[in-house]
């Protein structure tokens, strides 16, 4: 597993190998204040994600949450100028919800389970604040199509006004999903939204 150096990653989408905003994010609008990914989406990480989401290995939720939480703790410690307060100033953990079709296929919301473990280990309250509209699978879509698909896809159903939100997802591919969810939270009044993911697709 290739962990991402928090001092050398894109602050907008978590992309590794550079202490500046990446090419994809330069000039692009996002409502994420900061974003961190724990690891590069490579062979071992991909196998973990597939085993958890589609292989029925729900026990992996606790381990994924542990790795994500460890990355956030490390980022606060090693890159305080970039990620200071990522955990300690967060008011609530909010997860990016699964689509209706994914929920039916798997029988559970994979991010809700991870969020419960992460919330329990960090003592940051869990807020099940987002609902996903639409049911299309984005795995085969490019950046532009993902952005178009994600616009208006999320509805905030619990109060978030004035809150600092730690928004979590399993894998960032283009950042469109995280950005759209963050946008919904900001429109609903969240004061600050940081993103945290298990992995970032790269290359």
Language-model region placement:
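Glycine-rich phosphate/pyrophosphate-handling loop used in enzymes and phosphotransfer proteins
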Residues: 1-203
């Amino acid at each position: 597993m290739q962990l991402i150096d928090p001092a050398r990653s894109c602050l907008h989408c978590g992309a590794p190998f550079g202490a500046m905003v990446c090419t994809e994010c330069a000039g692009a609008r996002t409502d994420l204040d900061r974003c961190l990914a724990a690891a590069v989406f490579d062979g071992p990480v991909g196998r973990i994600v597939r085993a958890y989401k589609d292989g029925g290995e729900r026990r992996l939720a606790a381990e994924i949450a542990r790795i994500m939480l460890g990355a956030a703790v490390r980022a606060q410690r090693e890159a305080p100028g970039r990620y200071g307060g990522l955990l300690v100033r967060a008011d609530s953990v909010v997860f990016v919800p699964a689509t209706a079709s994914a929920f039916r296929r798997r029988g559970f919301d994979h991010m809700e389970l991870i969020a419960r473990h992460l919330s329990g280990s960090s003592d940051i309250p869990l807020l099940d604040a987002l609902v996903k509209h639409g049911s299309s699978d984005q795995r085969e879509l490019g950046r532009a199509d993902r952005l178009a698909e994600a616009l208006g896809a999320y509805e905030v159903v619990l109060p978030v006004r004035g809150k600092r939100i730690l928004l979590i997802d399993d894998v960032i591919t283009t950042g469109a999903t995280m950005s759209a969810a963050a946008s919904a939270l900001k429109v609903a009044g969240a004061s600050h939204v940081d993103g945290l993911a298990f992995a970032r697709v790269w290359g």
